[in-house]
UniProtKB/Swiss-Prot annotation:
In the N-terminal section; belongs to the zinc metallo-hydrolase group 3 family. Fe cation 2 binds at residues 103, 185, 243. It is an enzyme of class 1 (oxidoreductase). Coiled coil: none annotated. This is Putative diflavin flavoprotein A 2. SMART domains: Flavin_Reduct, Lactamase_B. Mediates electron transfer from NADH to oxygen, reducing it to water. This modular protein has 3 redox cofactors, in other organisms the same activity requires 2 or 3 proteins. It holds the Pfam family ODP.
Length: 579
């Protein structure tokens, strides 16, 4: 039985996950309806930091009333009660649907039943999607860049087309009176907090970056175009996003981050095109995971929805990309089938192609598509990813590792050139810095990973802490975020070769890194290597981005030495341009 309690203007639903709704006046005649999901963990790849999330909706009241987006279905009762407490829904004149992803449009049909005379304002593609979601006829109007509506009392709302952020149907909406822009997923973050605005930059910056890397980075070119259009609107006081705190206190800093990160992506020497069908099966989540793995290696990615993109747009990206990732489309999608045919017509034998199933119930057979590419002489980026059940954490790990393998393949020659370009004397001098040999092991849910490490150094006495350098292109990176726990296994001099060999093996994506290795389980759930000299259970406290590595500061929570007289294995190098 679900019980509900009310305090002021916030409702609480006492279920397994804490769900609350808050209303806040953010500007004249403008109310934010923030649905707070305190315990949301990793269901999408972008929830990796596990700090919950919010679903933000907005009410603008002039002489007419506008509702900007709705919320997730899980908030149905709470959201609708809150909305009714703010306004008679029959008074709503317009519902702006920024895009049709279910966490923002999941309650559009419910609101339309309460506000039958409201007109839905959305992009052409969004309205096509909505017609499949809303079962009764509704009033609708297509909006695009430059279109405006005047709702009175000075509130004139101008629209900006922002396709592929991160869905193909996205629009922004700018209120000229309040200078508030409503951006849905863009400039958001998965961070749940009672503070409406971005008061504490340090608290949110890791989540802000993680969210960008997962959702916005794959569409850096589209984001730069959208930001250029934003610049033409005039002054922006508040970015009212769809997830997390609204941007106000640090708006300039955070938008500059988006600008610089996106410019870096757009200037990348190497690009992989990700071709999929939005909102079909698990294509969105799977392609995000593959894209995350690719981006770890410094390779840029660009995403295109095969069902909505123009043929020339598909061919333009395919023609300049070093690699192509293709999610199997439904056999019934004529547009997606045409998109696949257009890819086959421009693909080159020097490109690498990776295929994945979407578990949508009507996938095009992956072997049929695979054979067509092989017959053209195209090499496979990785074995086709076959999804035979609802994908879980292990499936997403498989996708991330496959993406990382492809990125490393595409950057191998570039990295070799960079290594050879270093000053010989300088690299020899740097190589005289020696370190111990360690193996980092970690497990989160059903996903486990490990890596050989040598760049480890004690950093504090109270508390006991050390730093460890983790390359950005390591598969373990997604399990080594601030707040994550792991085990640092110390290898023993004279007794480390077998473990070193095991954890240096290049395995197929998804393979069990611990196969044949004796382990025990630490208190924090991570594997302890039985044959290690010592181990420490650790927690990551902070992270510093340094070019091609992250420097993690970690504290020690527990530890033990198995051989008191043993010595730590040491890695001696002659040059400093590799491990």
């Amino acid at each position: 039985m679900v019980s509900m309690s009310t305090t002021g203007n916030a409702h609480t639903e006492n279920v397994q996950h804490r769900l609350t709704v808050e209303t806040v006046e953010i500007a004249p005649n403008t109310t934010a309806i923030r649905c707070l999901d305190w315990d949301r963990d990793r269901f999408d790849i972008e929830f990796g930091l596990q700090n919950g999330t919010t679903y933000n909706s907005y009410l603008i009241r002039g002489e007419q009333t506008v509702l900007v987006d709705t919320s997730h279905q899980k908030f149905r009762q709470l959201y609708l009660e809150t909305l009714k407490g703010l306004i008679n829904p029959k008074a709503i004149d317009y519902i702006i649907v920024s895009h049709t992803e279910p966490d923002h449009s999941g309650l559009v049909e419910d609101v339309l039943q309460l506000a039958p005379r409201a007109t839905v304002l959305a992009s052409k593609i969004a309205l096509q999607f909505l017609e499949g979601l809303v079962h009764d006829p509704f009033s609708k109007r297509i909006v695009k860049s430059g279109d405006r509506i005047d709702i009175g009392k000075g509130h004139e709302i101008e629209f900006v087309s922002a396709p592929n952020l991160h869905w193909p149907d996205t629009i922004f909406s700018y209120d000229r009176k309040t200078e508030v822009i409503y951006t849905c997923d863009a400039f958001g973050m998965h961070f749940c907090d009672n503070r409406t605005f971005d008061e504490d930059l340090e608290a949110i910056e890791a989540d802000f970056r993680f969210y960008y890397d997962c959702l916005m980075g794959p569409n850096a070119r589209s984001l730069l175009n959208a930001m250029k259009r934003m610049g033409d609107l005039g002054k922006i006081k508040i970015i009212a996003n769809g997830h997390g705190p609204l941007l106000y206190h640090h708006l300039d800093v955070l938008t500059e981050c988006y600008q610089s990160w996106s410019q870096r992506q757009a200037k990348s020497e190497t690009t992989v095109g990700l071709f999929y069908v939005a909102d079909y099966g698990y294509s969105n989540l799977l392609v995000q995971a593959i894209g995350e793995g690719i981006q770890k290696t410094g390779v840029a990615v660009e995403m295109i929805d095969l069902s909505t993109a123009e043929i020339q747009e598909i061919q333009e990206l395919a023609g300049r990309a070093a690699g192509l990732i293709i999610g199997m489309p439904p056999t019934t999608s004529v547009a997606a089938q045409a998109g696949i045919s257009s890819l086959l017509s421009v693909v080159k034998d020097k490109q690498a192609v990776g295929l994945f199933e979407c578990f949508g119930g009507d996938d095009e057979p992956v072997d049929t598509i695979r054979r067509k590419f092989i017959d053209l002489g195209v090499k496979e980026a990785f074995p086709a990813i076959r999804i035979k059940d609802v994908p879980g954490a292990s499936a997403y790990q498989l996708c991330t590792e496959a993406g990382t393998d492809l990125g490393q393949l595409l950057t191998r020659e570039r990295n070799i050139k960079q290594i050879k370009s270093l000053d010989v004397n300088m690299e020899k001098a740097l190589g005289r810095i020696s370190n111990g040999l360690y193996i980092v092991t970690t497990k989160k849910g059903d996903v486990s990973s490990a890596m050989l490490a040598s760049w480890v150094s004690q950093a504090s006495l109270q508390p006991l802490g050390f730093t460890i350098a983790v390359a950005k292109d390591r598969a373990i990176d997604s399990l080594m975020q601030v707040g994550d726990r792991f085990v640092l296994n110390v290898l023993e001099e004279g007794n480390y070769q077998e473990l070193k060999k095991q954890f240096l093996k290049r395995l197929h994506p998804g393979a069990d890194r611990f196969a044949g290795v004796r382990t025990q389980t630490a208190k924090n759930g991570s594997p302890i290597l039985t044959d290690a000299l010592a181990y420490m259970e650790c927690e990551i406290q902070s992270s510093l981005e340094c070019s091609d590595h992250y420097i993690l500061y970690c504290t020690v929570e527990d530890g033990r030495v198995s051989k008191p007289d043993g010595l730590t294995a040491v890695r001696h190098r002659k040059v400093g341009n590799y491990y």
